[in-house]
Each structure stands twice: as C-alpha cells, then as structure tokens.
C-alpha cells in the first residue's frame, strides 16, 4: 500500500511534501563572531586543510537586512565577499510552503540546506548574495500567519522579491548592471512574474532550478499518480481527485471525496485553507511555460534527472518548446542532481516521495558538483566574473 501521508504537506510545501561546490561542502568548519547587527562568518574549506594546518581562508560577511511588505517585515541575509570593487548581485528565491531563505523547512529534518550552500559558494566566487524568508516562512511565521489569512497571493510573493531587489541595489558596491536571480521550484514562477512586471532593476539573467514547465496542478497530479502507482483502484481514485480539483479551480465549494486516502483529502483541504487563499487557486492554474516565452533576458534552466518533484523530460520539454527560437535560454539536466540540486547516487527508479523529501537537508548531503559548475559557468559568462 502506498502511503499518502506526505501529501498532508502537499505541493504548497515544496512541490511534493516539502524542499556549490562539490563533496567538500560536507564538512566545512565555521567560526562565527557576532558584532552589532551583523555577523561575520569565516568558512574553512576542508580541501585546503592539510596536516591540520589551514593553508587558505575564504572570508565573507553576512548581515541581516529587512524590508516591509504590507506592514509585515521580511527578513533576509546579505552576504558579501571579501575585497572591494563593484560586484554583481544574486537574489535567491526559495520554493513553496514554509521553505525559508536557506531553503530549510520545519517540515523536513536537517539543516544542510541548499540555499545557504549555494549562496556561500557563489559569494566565494565574488557575488553579493541575498536570500530571504518569505513572510510565511522562517522564525516569524507564527506571528505573520494570522495577518496573512485571506491575503496570501501570487502578487504578494512578487512584492517580497521586489523588496529584496530594492534592498540589494541599495547595497554599497553593488553593480546595478549585473543583477541576477537564482530561484528554486515554485520560486521560479515568482522570479518570472517579477521580471515581466519590473519597470526598474530587471534581472540581467535568471537561473531557474527545479522549475515546473507545466501547469502547477498538473505537476502535482503527476506526483500523486506516482505515489498511487501500486494501488489497484488508482484510476478511480484519480477520477475522484480530479472532480474535487475541478470544483476548486472553478471557485466552487469543494468537499474531499470520503473514498480518497487520508493524505489526498488532507491535500485537498489544505488548498481551501483560508491562509492559503487566494494564492493556492492562483498557483494551481499557473503555467510557467507561458511566462518563460515572454522574458527577453538570458535564462538558465536547471532540472536534475534525479528530481522526482518535477520531471526533466516532461517539464523540461514543455519549457524548451515554449522557448523555441529564443537563443538566450539554456537548458541543463544534471545526471545526479535532485530537486534542490543535491547529489543523489541512487537510480531514479529507486526514489520514492515518502523518503526523498526527508533526506533533502540531511547531514552529509552535498550539492551536485556538475549542477553547481553549470550555474557558476553560466553566471560567469553573463556577469564577466572570472573563475
């Protein structure tokens, strides 16, 4: 029997039940010193520690920044590389649900989170990076949720990102002609919407990772279908599920069919939770392929072949079709990268939704070296940063 338990957390919590360097990120040593409103972190890369002696130290400064969206504070972490001169900037946009700026989630165990690893790796390369907690994520989520009931929307997510850009461009030594975004999963949709709306401070280039290429509701349905693969009454269950979704999308009252598994019913109930509206209904019909075709700036799409939340063939093909004839859209499908760009050694056929999500941020997990290399090289080409 396939368990639908993980679907209590649903697509809204990271497209299935949620959320660079290479293997040497596994055992970094951190020395932390606090000063006033900022923190300085010194990362000691184990690849340069030999015989107990540190031969090289890469240092950079991280500080907390905040901005306001509809009267609610958004908290971010700005990380600057050592040295002066004008620097390109990168804003990170997390995936769905309570995924925070580090791409950690209270729904998933572990703190080895890809957003933080990517930000540190790219800061080492010379970029100023900014990652932030959505208002419905991070340590302030409890106090924010009551204020967000009935107000959660696609535009609200874009406004959070716009605030991040405003904060980034006000940073000393940022190069306004070299602004980038690195988004994951649902965050890629918000990045595309921002790019199509922004009159100022448009991104020089967009890195879209784990990007859905089909309507979000269809991607979520495929995930359910995969979990139900071994059920003898799968087809009947999916018809009942589809009827509920049809009512939901149409804005009609939706009562989960009592014959559906508990996890499916929990997913359907979560869609109509007041705290998730109108956002959930907007998200369910969103088609990223319609957006990517409208963006003029260079785009890099990275979908790992070990990603079981979006399908590199189905979603990648949909995005490639939408971008046909556009010369500045690049696609990369790393062989061993999962949804959050971690290295996954197992065959894709061995991976199940129930256990993959809980391993995303597990201790010892590292970013996929090839995925990171693709991102670093593409950003270097677009920004002029020497590797």
Model regions: which residues?
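N-terminal cap/lid segment of alpha/beta-hydrolase-fold proteins
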Residues: 45-85
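Short beta-strand/loop motif that positions the catalytic acidic residue
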Residues: 295, 301-303
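Alpha/beta-hydrolase active-site loop
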Residues: 149-171
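Short alpha-helix in the alpha/beta-hydrolase fold that links the catalytic acid
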Residues: 297, 308-322
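Short, surface-exposed "cap/lid" segments of acyl-processing enzymes
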Residues: 83-121
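Primarily recognizes the serine-hydrolase "nucleophile elbow" in alpha/beta-hydrolase
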Residues: 167-173, 177-227
């Amino acid at each position: 029997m396939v368990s639908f338990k993980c679907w209590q957390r649903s697509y809204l919590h990271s497209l299935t039940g949620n959320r660079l360097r290479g293997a040497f990120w596994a055992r970094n040593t951190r020395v932390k010193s606090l000063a006033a409103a900022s923190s300085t972190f010194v990362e000691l890369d184990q690849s340069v520690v030999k015989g107990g002696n540190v031969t090289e130290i890469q240092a950079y400064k991280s500080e907390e920044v905040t901005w306001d969206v509809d009267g609610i504070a958004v908290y971010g972490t700005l990380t600057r590389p050592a040295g002066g001169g004008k620097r390109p900037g990168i804003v990170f946009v997390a995936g769905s649900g309570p995924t925070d700026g580090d791409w950690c989630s209270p729904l998933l165990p572990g703190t080895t989170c890809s957003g933080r690893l990517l930000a540190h790796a790219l800061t080492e390369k010379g970029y100023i990076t900014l990652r932030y907690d959505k208002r419905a994520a991070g340590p302030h989520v409890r106090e924010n949720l009551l204020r967000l009931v009935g107000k959660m929307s696609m535009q609200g997510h874009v406004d959070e990102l716009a605030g991040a850009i405003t904060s980034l461009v006000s940073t000393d030594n940022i190069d306004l002609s070299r602004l980038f975004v690195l988004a994951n999963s649902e965050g890629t949709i918000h990045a595309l919407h921002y790019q199509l709306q922004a009159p100022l401070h448009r991104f020089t280039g967009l890195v879209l990772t784990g990007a859905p290429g089909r309507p979000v509701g269809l991607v979520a349905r495929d995930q359910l279908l995969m979990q139900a693969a071994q059920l003898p009454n799968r087809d009947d269950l999916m018809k009942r599920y589809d009827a509920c979704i049809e009512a939901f999308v149409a804005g009609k009252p939706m009562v989960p069919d009592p014959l559906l598994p508990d996890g499916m019913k929990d997913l359907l109930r979560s869609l109509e939770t007041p705290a998730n509206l109108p956002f959930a209904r907007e998200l369910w019909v969103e088609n990223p392929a319609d957006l990517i075709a409208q963006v003029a700036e260079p785009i890099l799409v990275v979908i790992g072949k070990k990603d079981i939340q979006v399908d590199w063939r189905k979603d990648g093909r949909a995005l490639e079709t939408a971008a046909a004839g556009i010369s500045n859209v690049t696609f990369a499908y790393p062989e061993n990268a999962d949804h959050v760009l971690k290295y996954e050694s197992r065959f894709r056929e061995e991976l199940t939704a129930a256990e993959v999500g809980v391993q995303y941020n597990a201790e010892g997990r590292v970013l996929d070296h090839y995925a990171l290399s693709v991102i670093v090289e593409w950003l270097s080409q677009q920004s002029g940063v020497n590797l």
